[in-house]
């Protein structure tokens, strides 16, 4: 029997990409899975596909009331919450400082940080009482952009660095009751979109980066699928396999940390 059998897991952005892969993996592990998903169509698809194995709640990660509504439903269903996985996010499609108009930069910043940073903070706030009671864990999705420049533009990179700081602070504040960690994947096949303020809400990451381009920069030389990244989340959520890790960021980046993103300078053509 899996360590996660009957554990109550709450994942944001479970309708596609990495979030969907996490939903699938934790259900396979025997967990009671819930997700907060913005898209009504994706919520309907999750319910149709997984039936009683999923509690899919339509809501926005930038709204605390939506989080609280989801947590209330989780506690009614499962009687507890063991792990919160903050995963929903948006990317900036490498929008650069020089080429982004000032007014767009400002509105794009607020939209992206609201999702990528405030969304994590609000989720942590809503889940903290239940996780303190269960002595559970929080896991947040980061990125190679949480460590290196070049994994996005300044908006995205700054948001992931901010999320790293949030993980460390929450790990400090919530110890010894709650373990708080992060997983930093590299690029993968997903439907990751950008901010509406930058005109990117209908543009997925795969329209900006080809599989060949992603594979070429990775030392392991393959194009990752979302399921390739679920293992670290399972390990971090497991009480038996993770008794000692908190405030840790796992780089699940196909070896990118060996050398980083090697461009001498991005502004050579300025």
From Swiss-Prot:
Positions of NAD(+) binding: 10-34
Enzyme Commission numbers on file: 1.3.1.87
Membrane-spanning parts: none
Keywords: Aromatic hydrocarbons catabolism, NAD, Oxidoreductase
Keyword Mitochondrion (UniProt): no
Active-site residues per Swiss-Prot or TrEMBL entry: 156
Catalytic activity: 3-(cis-5,6-dihydroxycyclohexa-1,3-dien-1-yl)propanoate + NAD(+) = 3-(2,3-dihydroxyphenyl)propanoate + NADH + H(+); (2E)-3-(cis-5,6-dihydroxycyclohexa-1,3-dien-1-yl)prop-2-enoate + NAD(+) = (2E)-3-(2,3-dihydroxyphenyl)prop-2-enoate + NADH + H(+)
Entries under Gene3D superfamilies matching the protein: NAD(P)-binding Rossmann-like Domain
Pfam families: adh_short (PF00106)
MF-aspect GO terms: 2,3-dihydroxy-2,3-dihydro-phenylpropionate dehydrogenase activity
PROSITE patterns listed in its UniProt record: ADH_SHORT
NCBIfam families reported for this sequence: 3PPDhyd_Dh_HcaB, PRK06200.1
PANTHER family: 3-PHENYLPROPIONATE-DIHYDRODIOL_CINNAMIC ACID-DIHYDRODIOL DEHYDROGENASE (PTHR43943:SF17), DEHYDROGENASE/REDUCTASE (SDR FAMILY) MEMBER 4 (PTHR43943)
Role this protein plays: Converts 3-phenylpropionate-dihydrodiol (PP-dihydrodiol) and cinnamic acid-dihydrodiol (CI-dihydrodiol) into 3-(2,3-dihydroxylphenyl)propanoic acid (DHPP) and 2,3-dihydroxicinnamic acid (DHCI), respectively.
UniProt protein name: 3-phenylpropionate-dihydrodiol/cinnamic acid-dihydrodiol dehydrogenase
Annotated gene: hcaB
């Amino acid at each position: 029997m899996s360590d996660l059998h009957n554990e109550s897991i709450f994942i944001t952005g479970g309708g596609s990409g990495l979030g969907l892969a996490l939903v699938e993996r934790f259900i396979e592990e025997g967990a009671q899975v819930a997700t907060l998903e913005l898209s009504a169509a994706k919520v309907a698809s999750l319910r149709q596909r997984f039936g009683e194995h999923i509690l899919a709640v339509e809501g926005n990660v930038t709204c605390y009331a939506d989080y609280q509504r989801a947590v209330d439903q989780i506690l009614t269903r499962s009687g507890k919450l063991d792990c919160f996985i903050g995963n929903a996010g948006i990317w900036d499609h490498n929008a650069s400082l020089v080429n982004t108009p000032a007014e767009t930069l400002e509105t794009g910043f607020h939209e992206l940080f609201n999702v990528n940073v405030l969304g994590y903070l609000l989720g942590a706030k809503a889940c903290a009482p239940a996780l303190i009671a269960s002595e559970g864990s929080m896991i947040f999705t980061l990125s190679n952009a949480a460590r290196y420049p070049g994994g996005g533009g300044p908006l995205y990179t700054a948001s992931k660095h901010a999320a790293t700081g949030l993980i460390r602070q929450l790990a400090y504040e919530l110890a010894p009751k709650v373990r708080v960690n992060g997983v930093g994947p590299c690029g993968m096949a997903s439907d990751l979109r950008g901010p509406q303020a930058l005109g990117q809400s209908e543009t997925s990451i795969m329209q900006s980066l080809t599989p060949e381009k992603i594979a070429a920069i990775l030392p392991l030389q393959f194009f990752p699928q979302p399921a390739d990244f679920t293992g670290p989340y399972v390990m971090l959520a497991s009480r038996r396999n993770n008794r000692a890790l908190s405030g840790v960021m796992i780089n699940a980046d196909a070896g990118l940390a060996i050398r980083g993103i090697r461009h001498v300078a991005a502004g050579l053509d300025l």
